[in-house]
């Protein structure tokens, strides 16, 4: 196009009428020159590749002939393998336990028949004694050996059949349960391990299994009288059904060398019957049937109450929901009254200087 740009209109008209000039102009264009160069380069490349392929022609022919030979050898090996396989099947069919059992049974019956025929001939006198002894013993031995082999082979044949029958009668194994998919948002549930049984009870008891009084301080000298500690404890006990027996009230301590007397005792409390003494009546009978002599202090067979029990009490058990509550107002289990002195009244007779 650059060559046509500089030409005049007259030159262009002449060029249009000249076909040779147009062809020359097309061949001199750069596009056609590039295509021609690419064509020559492709031809040179193809020529070099063809020459290289011709160099591999000899090894290719040799490899092809080797492949043909190997294929022929393979066919021969396949035919030989088929022949060996047929022989193996023939031998294996002849050596099957069932086939061997049949052959042994036939041979056993045959040798047994021959031994019986030998015995009959010997009985008829056709066979001499020496020949009979030599042949009959060997025949019977062979017959017994074959019989034992037949029995053992029968056991071998029966075992696989029994195992197959048991396997056929057994139910098919159950498939494992399908695994449930766990949602991604839900954390995996951890199975709680069972707790071992503990030695402590599941509910704390309000009392000890071995009740005992707390250890106090060591006493030196005379012990002062002191009542038991008072613990408030509601109870369902409504009091004694029979008449109560008041405790004997200790009187003032006598002087040294003087014994106790009824005149020195304190008068009984109002509302309770006084303790019978020697002045008012006979004493309480003892276990042996002997009554105490009048003039000695009489001790009540029941411990002194004074509104407090003579032993430490336990706190009340906790109430559970649904437990029936008592409708009767709670009453103390002992009649009210002043606390008696600690222990029993002092013994009669001369007082011990340690008190």
UniProtKB/Swiss-Prot annotation:
Compositional bias, Low complexity, is annotated for: 246-257
The protein's superkingdom reads Eukaryota
Gene Ontology CC terms, in alphabetical order: ESCRT I complex; late endosome membrane
Q: Is Transcription there in the keyword field? A: no
Q: How is it modified after translation?
A: Phosphorylated by TBK1.
Supply the SUPFAM superfamilies for this chain: Endosomal sorting complex assembly domain
What are the boundaries of the signal sequence? none
InterPro entries xref list: ESCRT_assembly_dom, Mod_r
Keywords in alphabetical order, please: Endosome, Membrane, Phosphoprotein, Protein transport, Transport
Q: Which residues carry this modification: Phosphoserine?
A: 29
Membrane topology, record value: Peripheral membrane protein
Instruction: Specify residue ranges for compositional bias: Pro residues.
Output: 170-186, 194-205, 321-355
- Which region ranges are annotated with the description Disordered? 159-355
Residues in VPS37 C-terminal domain copies: 78-167
One GO term (biological process)? protein targeting to membrane
- List the subcellular locations: Late endosome membrane
Q: Which Pfam families match?
A: Mod_r
- State the family named in the UniProt similarity comment for this chain: Belongs to the VPS37 family.
- Oligomeric and partner information: Component of the ESCRT-I complex (endosomal sorting complex required for transport I) which consists of TSG101, VPS28, a VPS37 protein (VPS37A to -D) and MVB12A or MVB12B in a 1:1:1:1 stoichiometry. Interacts with TSG101, VPS28, MVB12A and MVB12B. Component of the ESCRT-I complex (endosomal sorting complex required for transport I) which consists of TSG101, VPS28, a VPS37 protein (VPS37A to -D) and UBAP1 in a 1:1:1:1 stoichiometry. Interacts with HGS and STAM2. Interacts with CEP55.
Q: What is the role of this chain?
A: Component of the ESCRT-I complex, a regulator of vesicular trafficking process. Required for the sorting of endocytic ubiquitinated cargos into multivesicular bodies. May be involved in cell growth and differentiation.
Record protein name field? Vacuolar protein sorting-associated protein 37C
Please report the organism this UniProt entry assigns to the protein: Pongo abelii
Instruction: State the organism's lineage.
Output: Eukaryota, Metazoa, Chordata, Craniata, Vertebrata
